[in-house]
Amino acid sequence: MRILYGVQGTGNGHLSRARVMAKALMEQDIKVDFLFSGRKPDQYFDMQCFGDYRVQTGMTFATHSGRLNLPQTVRQNLSLSLMKDIQALDLSCYDLVLNDFEPISAWAARRQGVPSIGISHQAALIHPVPKMGNTWLNELLLMYFAPVDVALGCHWHHFGFPILPPFVEVVPCSSEHTHQILVYLPFEDVDTIASFLAPFSDYLFLVYHSQQPQVQTAKHIQWYGFNRDGFKQHLASCGGVIGNAGFELASEALTLGKKLLVKPLIGQFEQLSNVAALQLLAAADSMMTLDINVLKRWLKAASPNPIAYPQVGDTLVKWLRGGDWHHSQPLCQELWAQVALPDTWR
């Protein structure tokens, strides 16, 4: 079996899931080529596990000050290059296309009649799971942005549907620094973040961001450019996580038993829906703006117990090899049977 794996590059969560799958596919001797789209080639990092991967433009989302900028998103994606890339992608040597919300490989597979399986958090939102900010446009986006023959979604809870657990790979840590807080708010302005954290000098905030403040900030706020290994180590040892409401970081925090405070990207349906799910499960605190009062209460909160999600990638690859791709319920049941969910989630 030879597979093309298309991955949406706009979010690090897609890349994290692809890393888990790359390892599982390699261990089971399946030939796989990776195609990434959605960000510039020089903005990918720690990509060694993907071998000789390809990068194409694809589609991406524009943001400003913690909000989705829909007009700018439309403007920057109005291009004939996407259609040309879809038409130019030759899939004749592949038996299957795996897809994590990546439009070029998805539409090329549909045009050429190659079987395709979607593995993404977005695919879980096709089911009536908790949602917020949903519109007919969002429903169209879920169905047609990266259409596939079989859609396998992943979520923190199955909610009674054939959904996979999260794909999580975390660094274990023997010691926890309860007064160290990991902060990852990539869509927020750095000066706004600094002002938000400034009053809480009893804590050490480890802030990962692509930019640095123009003026020196307080000593209890440390700034880091994104480094995957350093981020994983800080995530493992911190006492809590403040982030946007992306799926993967929240999954890692839940797996490690870290208290979680999320601020969604306003206007982004997936992140708003993640907030709805976290609220229903009582798994995190949330804020729609960087609210100092919410932060003050959250810092005093206790940490939850960790959730031991299974190694989804290994089981999924075995299922892929079996070839019965239109029957995913047994796969999902097998994986969730290994998860001890909190009593309050049941």
Specify the residue positions occupied by each region the protein language model found.
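Short amphipathic alpha-helix
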Residues: H14-M26
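C-terminal amphipathic helix plus adjacent low-complexity
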Residues: K296-R346
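Catalytic binding pocket for nucleotide-activated donors in carbohydrate/polymer assembly enzymes
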Residues: A250, L254-P304
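A nucleotide-sugar donor-handling region in carbohydrate enzymes
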Residues: H127-D189, V207-Q211
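Conserved nucleotide-sugar donor-binding subdomain of glycosyltransferases
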Residues: R67-L96, F101-I104
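Conserved nucleotide-sugar phosphate-binding/catalytic loop shared by glycosyltransferases and other
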Residues: Q8-N12, E27-S79, L290
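Donor-nucleotide binding loops and adjacent catalytic segments primarily
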Residues: A22, F167-V171, S175-G240
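A donor-sugar binding/catalytic signature common to diverse glycosyltransferases
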Residues: V97-P103, A108, H234-S273
